[in-house]
């Protein structure tokens, strides 16, 4: 499968992007993965996204001196070396990965359409959060995409990932660089940026 790697500094970390072309994917490409047999029953989309995500993860791990491919955990999560944390996300034909010494979460999302935002609002934010989003100065579809992505990154950065849902992560404030999220007795600072029609969020949880 044809891929292209680029990197971008963001919030004190290096994000590793892998653009991939699913059209020229073949099953033999998966043999690069030590755990390729675990994907034999997956659909083509899942296989291409997984492969691209692991390629991005390998680039990210190289920064820390590792030459391994993250395995698949019991909950289908990437298994990182014991001394580091990492996160992988996908959007369209883009995969993204980051590695850190502290718990970290990354997410990449295409900005919602107005219709999609309208349909998903009640599943992502509370009425109180809706008021905060309405006052943030962004188009609502963009603001809701950012809220969704920020909560995804906060969830991924949680060391103990429970069955908490989007409404359990409450946005209490935000500015042009960060979204502040509260869940139970924890606070999460989520960095964000817009890249063309894409929202990228990153949460490092100390």
Swiss-Prot record:
Superkingdom of the organism of origin: Bacteria
Chain sites annotated for binding Mg(2+): 107, 109, 152
GO biological process, one term: siderophore metabolic process
Entries under InterPro entries matching the protein: 4-PPantetheinyl_Trfase_dom, 4-PPantetheinyl_Trfase_dom_sf, 4PPT_N, Enbac_synth_compD-like
Pfam families cross-referenced by the UniProt entry: 4PPT_N, ACPS
Gene3D superfamilies given in the database record: 4'-phosphopantetheinyl transferase domain
Enzyme class: transferase
UniProt catalytic activity: apo-[aryl-carrier protein] + CoA = holo-[aryl-carrier protein] + adenosine 3',5'-bisphosphate + H(+); apo-[peptidyl-carrier protein] + CoA = holo-[peptidyl-carrier protein] + adenosine 3',5'-bisphosphate + H(+)
Cofactor: Mg(2+)
GO molecular function term, any single one: magnesium ion binding
Subunit structure, interactors included: EntB, EntD, EntE, and EntF form a multienzyme complex called enterobactin synthase.
Additional remark text: Deletion of the C-terminal 25 residues of EntB results in very strong decrease of the catalytic efficiency of EntD.
Family stated for the protein in its record: Belongs to the P-Pant transferase superfamily. EntD family.
NCBIfam families hit by this protein: PRK10251.1
Name of this chain's protein: Enterobactin synthase component D
Organism: Escherichia coli (strain K12)
């Amino acid at each position: 499968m044809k891929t292209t790697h680029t990197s971008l500094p963001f919030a004190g970390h290096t994000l590793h992007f892998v653009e991939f072309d699913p059209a020229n994917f073949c099953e033999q490409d998966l043999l690069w993965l030590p755990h390729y047999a675990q994907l034999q029953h997956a659909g083509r989309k899942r296989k291409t996204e997984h492969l691209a995500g692991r390629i991005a993860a390998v680039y990210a791990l190289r920064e820390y001196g590792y030459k391994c491919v993250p395995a698949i955990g019991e909950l289908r999560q990437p298994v990182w070396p014991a001394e580091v944390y990492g996160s992988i996300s996908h959007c369209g034909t883009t995969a993204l990965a980051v590695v850190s010494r502290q718990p970290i979460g990354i997410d990449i999302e295409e900005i919602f359409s107005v219709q999609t935002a309208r349909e998903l609002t009640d599943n992502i934010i509370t009425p109180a959060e809706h008021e905060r989003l309405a006052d943030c100065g962004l188009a609502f579809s963009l603001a809701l995409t950012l809220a969704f992505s920020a909560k995804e990154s906060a969830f991924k950065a949680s060391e103990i990932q429970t069955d908490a849902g989007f409404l359990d992560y409450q946005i209490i404030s935000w500015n042009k660089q960060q979204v502040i999220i509260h869940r139970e007795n924890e606070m999460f600072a989520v960095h964000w940026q817009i890249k063309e029609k894409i929202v990228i969020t990153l949460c490092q949880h100390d």
